[in-house]
Amino acid sequence: VTSVFRAVAMLPVAVGLVLAVSAAGRAAFQEASAPPAKAARAPDVVYVPTPHDVVDKMLEMARVKKEDVVYDLGCGDGRIVVAAAKKGAKAIGYDLSRERVEEARANVKKNKVEKLAEIFEKDIFTLDLSEANVITLYLLPKLNVKLIPQLEKLKPGSRIVSHDFDMKGVQPDRMVHMTSQEDGESHTIYLWTVPLKKEPGHEPTGQQ
């Protein structure tokens, strides 16, 4: 509005000033009455980091190598992304938390893997996963199930690994129990390979 007043002040015709003030007033009213921008939704889970030795086991089970493209859905501080990039893979992390995204980007930079790793603040349920052939998860079971429609579109042979939580209605190819040397706790890692194997009597729909 200030810039409008400055421009109009230079006009020699008083009517021009009146018209400009009127237009500025309408614009200000429209801006004030416009609905507020929609805020990003809250993260789906409370962030709990995966112990580093569990991360290593997840990537080992997924057979991650430099030819792979790894997507970490709900990447937290980026430790899985960094570990995958250190194996030479292209690694991309997604998270809804601005704080976690900034932390993950800082960890990518700290570990000097910027050429292979990227972090994005995005809703994982809106993503096109077709570029990836390895997906890593540490989400709740109902969220794993909600991802099924997206996971089923992955290329054949793509691997999915989940820390601690299964995917109801889908049979894992492998399940490993381990005790972390980092936290002393027992952890379970699930591995699935695309095409996903539906368990008898179950038809996962991706609905909660």
What are these regions (language model features)?
Residues G25-D68, R98-E131:
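S-adenosyl-L-methionine
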Residues D77-A89:
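Conserved SAM-binding loop of SAM-dependent methyltransferases across substrates and taxa
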Residues S130-K146:
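A short SAM/SAH-binding and catalytic strip from SAM-dependent methyltransferases
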Residues K142-Q207:
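C-terminal substrate-binding/active-site "lid" region of AdoMet-derived donor-dependent transferases
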